[in-house]
């Protein structure tokens, strides 16, 4: 029970010392270590085998004790007395002295939790044989910041301070109880942390594979396995370790060893004097100078990539080294970037002298090296001399220049640019050539169309401004080479077109012999149409007549092959595959000189069969989407405005609405379509206005005749009805007699009359026949008048017998 109480008091004292450690570390500015009188010094054997070291570390750790905190035995005992007032203070001293004696004789390693200072620094832990509680101990000012263990192994020049004489940066690990504890290289190698002092003290590494060469100075070994320590001075080893998170500050004359556990362990009796620590300041200054000397030649990438810098004094040289390395690389990169574009241009040696060190002129050089080689060499060499603002203007020049100037007149362009300022010269020269492309093409065309001998004169002015030949050579490569903003067309004739249309011929004329029979595209089209495709024809107006596109300006014919497929892509519903298959197969002439005064150009193109009726209707409609669509470009839109809708898109159709082989006279298919009023043939839509008026008149006459016939029949029927009604009105008096005679009363009347006649005759029979007969008549009249007083007399007029 008494021993348990001592253990509890020890725990309380350890906790108080750990809490008081940050303030103590903050106050101490340099390492001052005092040894109490209860220290029992013991030398550790440096030749302890690795097996013994590893076996010694396998023992269970005793009670943890705080590390490298500035405290005294009196302070610890006083704090323990405050916490345990009922205990005797002398028992604590006896406990510590007994515990020190027991732990001194035992070689069991001891591990403890790290005690961090206010600056976030921690002492390294290790395995030591003696555990000594100093009366006043403070950590050295070279305490390093805690870093991960992985940081010790990733540095190439890292050296361990586990066996050196200063505090090294520990790696943070987790103890068995889950509490964080500091571990140095000795925790990973399980070796003895102390070494025996001799006249030439040598601190060995913590890994059994480490080979130590004889030396007169203390050498600090690294933590990496199979590391050979070469003879070196203390300042050199310290300088190398300053680069890595683990910092070692060694002194060959000092015999005091600060173990990884933070407990001071003397290695020799001669090293316990205080003046030894007075030389630590001098040693640190020498370390700083050595670090500065060593780091400058070793300013490599690992120096800048180390995340944790251990010694504050060594931080500045490391930053300087990293800054020096970056400054050294930056000029190299800048020189490469500046030199690269300049050397790529072969015409720059006289120009690169004033702008060799300028980085602002490099981007303009880049932009111009990609554009200006397409122009003349004189342009590229002179343009680079200008300022960056002026270079921007010169980069816009090759958009219209590259295909025109170098191909025709390079010598002429250079004299215009050299004597004048560079930006105005290309800007004034190139637009002049560009804008003069149309006037030479149009002006000669107006005067030279009537004859064919003027076509050479048209070619000569086109060659002079060096624009027309350029567009002719590049027509198959780029769309903008023909004309950027308009379609090449021929100006209309004044009055020849109107006079020729009034005299249509009765027989087709023969095409002129100087015109080609067909115009094929530059690339041969060998793909079949397919079952869903068909051929259509698109005729053009006088602006693109066949003579103009063949003999006078071939570029006008080339633009039909280029822009007509684009204009046909307007229709909604076409798939991408169908749009790709839209192409102009050929351009053929259609002889319309008798009707229109020129030979019509007809383009034969491919088109899906399913959309043929819609396209046919759109071509006939002036305001359809075929003419109004601009989504495929203004050039394609302008080309559709030159389509002649009077000629059907059905292949072979002519201006008269007949196939090309039928001619303009009667016969063949010509007698079928126009004369059939209800004809649904394809040629019915091409009927003339007179034919359509005739058909409408016939239809109207038929309807009128039918209406008149109906009205006449109605009148006749009505008159017949009225006549019949009048006839019935005249015989309406006999109607009651018919009613009377149609029934039994008539018979009865007849019978009664007969009876009366018999009666009267029988009565008056004897008097004579005549009288009886007369009596019979009078009696009948009397009987009729008596019995049928309401019936009129004319009954007997129609039928003397009285029957119907």
Curated annotation (Swiss-Prot):
Residues on Cytoplasmic side: 716-804
Polar residues biased stretches? 81-90, 109-126, 170-188, 345-394, 493-508, 731-744
Q: For the region Serine/threonine rich region (STR), give the residue spans.
A: 46-475
Q: Where is the signal peptide?
A: 1-20
Q: Could you tell me the Gene Ontology terms of the biological process aspect for this record? A: establishment of cell polarity; fungal-type cell wall organization; hyperosmotic response; osmosensory signaling pathway via Sho1 osmosensor; signal transduction involved in filamentous growth
| Cited InterPro entries | MSB2 (IPR039295)
Q: Where in the cell is it found?
A: Cell membrane; Vacuole membrane
Annotated segments matching region HKR11-MSB2 homology domain (HMH): 482-641
* Superkingdom of source: Eukaryota
Q: Which GO terms describe its molecular function?
A: osmosensor activity
Inducing or repressing factors: Expression is significantly reduced when PMK1 or MST12 are disrupted.
Alphabetically ordered keywords of this record: Cell membrane, Glycoprotein, Membrane, Signal, Transmembrane, Transmembrane helix, Vacuole, Virulence
Give the Extracellular membrane side ranges. 21-694
Composition-biased stretches (Gly residues):
660-671
Provide the membrane topology annotation: Single-pass membrane protein
The record lists glycosylation at 45, 157, 298, 308, 357, 393, 427, 433, 629, 638, 669, 683, 686
Indicate the transmembrane segments per the record: 695-715
Q: Residue ranges under compositional bias (Low complexity)? A: 46-58, 69-80, 128-143, 150-169, 189-202, 395-407, 427-476, 672-686, 774-787
Q: What happens when the gene is disrupted?
A: Reduces significantly appressorium formation and virulence.
Q: What is one GO cellular-component annotation here?
A: vacuolar membrane
Family classification:
Belongs to the HKR1/MSB2 family.
How is this protein named in the record? Answer: Cell surface sensor MSB2
Query: Could you tell me the gene encoding this protein?
Result: MSB2
């Amino acid at each position: 029970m008494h021993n348990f109480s001592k253990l509890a008091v020890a725990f309380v004292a350890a906790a108080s010392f750990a809490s008081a450690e940050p303030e103590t570390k903050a106050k101490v500015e340099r390492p001052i270590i005092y040894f109490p009188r209860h220290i029992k010094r013991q030398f550790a054997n440096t030749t302890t085998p690795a097996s013994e070291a590893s076996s010694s570390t396998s023992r269970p750790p005793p009670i943890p004790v705080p590390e490298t905190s500035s405290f005294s035995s009196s302070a610890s005992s006083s704090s323990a007395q405050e916490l345990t007032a009922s205990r005797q203070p002398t028992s604590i001293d006896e406990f510590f002295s007994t515990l020190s004696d027991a732990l001194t004789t035992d070689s069991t390693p001891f591990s403890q939790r790290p005690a961090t200072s206010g600056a976030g620094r921690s002492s390294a832990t290790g395995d030591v044989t003696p555990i000594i509680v100093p009366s006043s101990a403070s950590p050295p000012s070279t305490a390093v910041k805690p870093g991960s263990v992985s940081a010790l192994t990733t540095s190439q020049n890292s050296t361990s301070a586990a066996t050196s004489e200063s505090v090294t940066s520990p790696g943070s690990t987790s103890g068995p109880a889950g509490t964080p504890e500091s571990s140095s290289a000795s925790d990973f190698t399980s070796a003895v942390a102390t070494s025996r002092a001799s006249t030439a003290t040598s601190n060995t590494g913590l890994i059994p594979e480490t080979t130590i060469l004889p030396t007169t100075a203390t050498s600090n070994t690294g933590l990496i396995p199979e590391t050979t320590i070469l003879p070196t001075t203390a300042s050199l080893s310290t300088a190398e370790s300053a680069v890595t998170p683990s910092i070692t500050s060694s002194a060959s004359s000092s015999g005091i060893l600060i173990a990884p556990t933070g407990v001071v362990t003397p290695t020799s009796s001669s090293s316990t004097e205080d003046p030894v620590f007075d030389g630590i300041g001098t040693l640190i200054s020498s370390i700083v100078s050595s670090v500065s000397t060593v780091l400058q030649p070793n300013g490599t990438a690992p120096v800048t990539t180390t995340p944790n810098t251990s010694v504050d004094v060594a931080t500045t040289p490391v930053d300087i080294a990293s800054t020096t390395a970056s400054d050294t690389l930056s000029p190299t990169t800048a020189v490469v970037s500046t030199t690269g574009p300049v050397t790529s241009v072969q015409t720059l040696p006289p120009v690169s002298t004033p702008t060799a060190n300028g980085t602002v002129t490099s981007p303009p050089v880049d932009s111009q090296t990609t554009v200006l080689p397409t122009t003349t060499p004189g342009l590229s060499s002179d343009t680079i001399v200008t300022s960056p603002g002026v270079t921007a203007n010169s980069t816009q020049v090759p958009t219209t220049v590259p295909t025109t100037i170098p191909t025709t007149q390079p010598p002429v362009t250079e004299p215009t640019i050299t004597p004048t300022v560079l930006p105005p010269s290309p800007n004034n020269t190139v637009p002049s050539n560009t804008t003069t492309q149309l006037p030479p093409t149009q002006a000669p065309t107006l005067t030279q169309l009537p004859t064919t001998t003027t076509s050479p004169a048209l070619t000569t002015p086109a060659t002079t401004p060096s624009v027309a030949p350029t567009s002719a050579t590049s027509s198959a490569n780029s769309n903008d080479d023909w004309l950027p903003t308009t379609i090449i067309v021929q100006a209309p004739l004044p009055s020849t077109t109107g006079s020729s249309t009034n005299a249509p011929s009765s027989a087709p004329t023969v095409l002129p012999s100087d015109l080609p029979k067909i115009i094929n595209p530059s690339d041969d089209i060998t793909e079949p149409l397919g079952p869903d495709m068909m051929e259509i024809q698109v005729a053009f107006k006088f602006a693109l007549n066949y003579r103009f596109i063949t003999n006078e300006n071939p570029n006008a014919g080339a633009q039909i092959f280029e822009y007509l497929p684009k204009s046909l892509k307007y229709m909604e519903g076409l798939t991408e595959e169908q749009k790709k298959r839209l192409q102009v197969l050929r351009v053929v002439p259609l002889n319309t000189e008798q009707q229109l005064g020129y030979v019509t150009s007809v383009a034969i193109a491919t088109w899906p069969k399913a959309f043929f009726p819609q396209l046919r209707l759109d071509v006939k409609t002036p305001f359809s989407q075929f003419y109004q669509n601009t989504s495929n470009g203004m050039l394609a839109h302008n080309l559709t405005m030159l389509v002649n809708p009077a000629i059907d898109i059905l292949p072979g159709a002519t201006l008269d609405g007949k196939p090309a082989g039928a001619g303009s006279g009667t016969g063949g298919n010509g007698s079928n379509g126009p004369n059939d009023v209800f004809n649904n043939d394809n040629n019915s839509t091409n009927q003339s206005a007179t034919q359509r008026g005739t058909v409408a008149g016939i239809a109207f006459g038929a309807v009128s005749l039918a209406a008149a016939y109906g009205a006449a029949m109605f009148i006749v029927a009505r008159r017949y009805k009225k006549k019949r009604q009048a006839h019935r009105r005249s015989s309406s008096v006999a109607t009651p007699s018919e009613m009377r005679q149609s029934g039994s009363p008539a018979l009865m009347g007849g019978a009664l009359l007969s009876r009366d006649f018999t009666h009267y005759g029988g009565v008056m029979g004897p008097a004579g026949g005549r009288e009886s007969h007369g009596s019979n008549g009078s009696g009948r009249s009397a009987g009729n008048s008596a019995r049928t007083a309401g019936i009129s007399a004319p009954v007997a007029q129609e039928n003397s017998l009285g029957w119907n």
